[in-house]
Amino acid sequence: MENSVAPFVLYSGTEPRTPGEDSLPLPAEEEGAASTAQTPCSLSASLCFSSGDDSPPQSRASAAEGSEASPPSLRSDLRVVETQWDVSSAASPESPEECARPEEPASPEDPPSRHEHARPVELESLDELGEPVPVPPGVGSVHGEPDLVIEVAGRRLRAHKAVLAARSDYFRARASRDVLRVQGVSFTALRLLLADAYSGRMAGVRPDNVAEVVAGARRLQLPGAAQRATEAMAPQLSLDNCYEVLSAGKRQRLTELRDAAYRFMSDHYLEVLREPAVFGRLSGAERDLLLRRRLCTGRACLLAAALGTTGERSGSRPQSPSGDAESRGDAAVYCYQAEAGEWRELTRLPEGAPARGCGLCVLFNYLFLAGGVAPAGPDGRARPSDQVYCYNPVTDSWSTVRPLRQARSQVQLLALDGHLYAVGGECLLSVERYDPRADRWTAVAPLPRGAFAVAHEAATCNGEIYVSGGSLFYRLLKYDPRRDEWQECPCSSSRERSADMVALDGFLYRFDLCGSRGEAQAAVGSGGGVSVFRYHCLAKQWSQCAVHLRPPGAPAGLQPFRCVALDGTIYCVSRAGTWRFVPSQDTEAGSDMGPGGSFEPEPLGSPLDVRGVLFPFVLNLPEKPDRGEQGAV
């Protein structure tokens, strides 16, 4: 078997070459050994090449010039030879060939060598990123210089391991690393998250980047940061971007973003309902969720609106809208604070809202005010108003909706099946219905001719509207929205003046003031009393609950009051006091014997120094401490 010997290529030279010109120098102690091992013939080492390359020998300068065109493998071999030459000639003065040695790849596309990875790089600190990052006092002195380099998206940040490890399991598990490469997180999101880790305050979050910040907080296991980012973004939500935030939350399965978008849509339900680009793109389940949140969030509270004296009937008919408008100084909404046992002002009626003769009701946990007596015009005469105002208790703000088709005073405003109904008015039989999604009023079946000039009381029960009124005798009318028609209902045997009518558990409860017409004054004394009747809406029968009841603590001359149902109890609110009437459920509905009922012994009091009539209603108020504490009334 023959031994393979590398071929030798000989080139004739005109003169001997000295080390340092075209050949690589060798150390003195290895020079003899090298010549013995690498020169098997009598020729000089500069003329012998033991490689298999057939190319002629090159000088150091030519090798540097050809490094750009050589493959990476050849250039890496040349780099090793050059490094050995640097070691051998470290003590010698710098030669021209050293200046020609390339320090970096000539092209940006060329990959860096092993030695270039080891070169120190200039890293960006948190304070060099445009906006200063709030750092708690003492962090720098306690932890010293940053000891962690975080690489993301081709950029680097410096931080302290101890700070990040204390707030994230992700960084705690990688505390041994000095350089940490993070994937799946943008540089902007990482910068905001690091600033939050140092300061505990999330700044710079917007609806267009909140998704990547929350996703980055989850990836880096910063649970508190995700919630703080959502809270910082929430005030920036609007009708223009709420659906995009919701879509991003659903697409990336970010619960915090979904909840924030749903919360905004629920808090601004009417605006979302009128916006087809938002409400029209929601599924049926999402629409039900928004309405459930709107109706169930918060705590149901007893409220009362103090309106002008026009709404208080001294006789069978309310006052005419003619005459000067009264002062609106007392036109406000009060909330009963059960913990403190007192009424406190919640909000005041907006500027321009009629405080006399208007109707009010609650729809979608909004308070609506419609109609009334407008302030006197240039001629000094007051006229009915067609304005409609809306109060949102969640945002504590008033707004206007589309006006009525016809101006009305002494109007009855009711909410039924997601619509508003404006029934009658003084000397009016027409009825209008408001669709909040279309923001439009339309006419429906009017009251029957000859019914009554003014509807005194109105209530909704079992999906129908009941209206009571009349001067010489009372009539009870029922409106069926499915048939769009009015029907006559049986009336009670009482001929007393009615204070109010309210619906509860399928019944209509009517409160009459005894002795108001001089019939039962002798029986109850000079102070009078209250008789309660109820009407079973399905059986169409009246029964008597109580006769000549005296509200506890009521003054000698019982003033008219208004009623509202809350938690199975009927609250009777007036300027003289607030009483709770609890109907008894012992007797079956429709029987000849009344079910009974009584007032609770402890009255709740009433707002002090309030003129006009108190119209009670129920709203769900958000759970906020000290809400409405502008001052005890």
From Swiss-Prot:
Keywords: Kelch repeat, Phosphoprotein, Repeat. Residues 146-206 form the BTB domain. The keyword Phosphoprotein applies. Residues 1-118 are annotated as: Disordered. Transmembrane segments: none annotated. Kelch repeats lie at residues 317-365, 366-418, 419-463, 465-506. Residues 61-73 have a biased composition (Low complexity). The modification Phosphoserine is found at residues 70, 73, 92, 95, 107, 113. InterPro entries: BTB/POZ_dom, Kelch-typ_b-propeller, Kelch/BTB_domain_protein, Kelch_1, SKP1/BTB/POZ_sf. It holds the Pfam family Kelch_1. Residues 35-60 have a biased composition (Polar residues). This is Kelch repeat and BTB domain-containing protein 11. The gene is Kbtbd11.
